[in-house]
Amino acid sequence: MAERGRKRPCGPGEHGQRIEWRKWKQQKKEEKKKWKDLKLMKKLERQRAQEEQAKRLEEEEAAAEKEDRGRPYTLSVALPGSILDNAQSPELRTYLAGQIARACAIFCVDEIVVFDEEGQDAKTVEGEFTGVGKKGQACVQLARILQYLECPQYLRKAFFPKHQDLQFAGLLNPLDSPHHMRQDEESEFREGIVVDRPTRPGHGSFVNCGMKKEVKIDKNLEPGLRVTVRLNQQQHPDCKTYHGKVVSSQDPRTKAGLYWGYTVRLASCLSAVFAEAPFQDGYDLTIGTSERGSDVASAQLPNFRHALVVFGGLQGLEAGADADPNLEVAEPSVLFDLYVNTCPGQGSRTIRTEEAILISLAALQPGLIQAGARHT
């Protein structure tokens, strides 16, 4: 038993092996430490490079903002949806809506307001229009077609399922606005839809902007949202995705001077056009158009930030003012800063609304550009 408990003496080579093992272990520890230090240094270098790149991008963006290439003012147009009821067939109703969309896009209209001039806002909307609100059928159809045409082609399938109102939308001429881009077209801004794709926490969502690659943005957003993306100037050609950040839909207009389409708003009556303005202080310049107005050539437009031009239907603005329960005015002219006749000496007894939009915006455009640019 004593012999079994006694330590066996080391052989002549075992002590040396033990020393070699310790040296090898110490050497491995030092190598591992060096490797960790090297890895940490590389990580810090990458972080520093990313910070420098972010700082450089911020400086470039700040310099771009200082250039002030944008358009500071907005232009809104309001018209009654009842003009569609004057068309003789579903095809002509659709084509009429397309003419209005084209006219507004040509003159860079930022907002189209479709109002109900016939006082039908109190009626219940039934059938396929349930849930839209208290609006007339023509108003809703006009608004839907206007929205459809404004949407870039590569996003329409996601936002516009098959609908009876859009049955003949294939007949319409495209707007071909700056935000309706081809796949390989280069641009600082693009419209896109947030795709339903899993992302790691703290990393941004992916957006389909109609290009060969998706765009990775700086925020996590709900799938299905339509967003305006500003693409980074430096894009690595070998990356699986492009990179950019989500910006306001107004940025292309205010920072780059690009026309970026229009928004569509439904108003239950003429007074709601003014009362439900999307701007904090409302419209600071309102213009009514009528054959009973003063000559547009003598009109002096004041400085403005948000202009609104209102058109009447077959019976003129008087019909909308009379049918509105919120208005108690003898003449619609008192509702506007300017009440103008944009086509004096007309050779036809009537000017259709789609014609009046083209005529009026062409007549007002020079004054609007000057007065809008003067606003500080």
UniProtKB/Swiss-Prot annotation:
S-adenosyl-L-methionine binds at R292, G312, N341, T342. Keywords: Cell cycle, Cell division, Centromere, Chromosome, Cytoplasm, Cytoskeleton, Kinetochore, Methyltransferase, Mitosis, RNA-binding, rRNA processing, S-adenosyl-L-methionine, Transferase. Its EC number is 2.1.1.-. Residues 1-33, 49-71 are annotated as: Disordered. Belongs to the class IV-like SAM-binding methyltransferase superfamily. Depletion with RNAi causes a significant accumulation of cells in later prometaphase with misaligned chromosomes. It comes from the Eukaryota. It is found in: Cytoplasm, Cytoskeleton, Spindle; Chromosome, Centromere, Kinetochore; Cytoplasm, Cytoskeleton, Microtubule organizing center, Centrosome. InterPro entries: Alpha/beta_knot_MTases, NA-bd_OB-fold, Put_MeTrfase-C9orf114-like, tRNA_m1G_MTases_N. One of its GO terms (biological process) is rRNA base methylation. Its main location: cytoplasm. This is 28S rRNA (uridine-N(3))-methyltransferase. One of its GO terms (molecular function) is miRNA binding. It comes from Homo sapiens. Transmembrane segments: none annotated. S-adenosyl-L-homocysteine binds at T289, R292, G312, N341, T342. Pfam families: Methyltrn_RNA_3. It catalyses: uridine in 28S rRNA + S-adenosyl-L-methionine = N(3)-methyluridine in 28S rRNA + S-adenosyl-L-homocysteine + H(+). S-adenosyl-L-methionine-dependent methyltransferase that specifically methylates the N3 position of a uridine in 28S rRNA. Required for association of the centrosomes with the poles of the bipolar mitotic spindle during metaphase. Also involved in chromosome alignment. May promote centrosome maturation probably by recruiting A-kinase anchor protein AKAP9 to centrosomes in early mitosis. Binds specifically to miRNA MIR145 hairpin, regulates MIR145 expression at a postranscriptional level. Interacts with INCA1. Residues 15-33 have a biased composition (Basic and acidic residues).
